[in-house]
Amino acid sequence: MVLGGLAGFAGVVAALALAAARDVAGSGRLIVAFQAHHYYRTAMYLAEFGAALGLADDVVVLEVFAPGETPIPGVSGLAMAAQVPLDPAHVVFEPSWSAVAGQLADRAGPGDLVMTLGAGDIGLIGLEILEILRERK
């Protein structure tokens, strides 16, 4: 199953969404792709978002979605990935948009729940993940 959600607010909102997704996943694994929105918001909630993402089994972090903004040094998708309290084998920063769906599909198995969270164009990737998974059957 592939599920998408908006999580551009504080880490507590992301944590609630992930806790609900964990219930939906049941005995399956929860695999999450996350794209933070705005550099200033990411800077403020970096640790909270990272902790929330730790509720997943596997996490793929994209670069911050911040069109027209000036980057803040030290605030990035890579910095977000470093905040996720999971074994490094289960957290990846994927800077290449075209590789994200494949990363998620590679991690997913029967009964798993793949969830996209964040703002920007992350929600567009769900159909691509489903297509890859169908082709692999």
Can you name each region flagged by the protein language model?
Residues 1-137:
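ATP-dependent carboxylate-amine ligase
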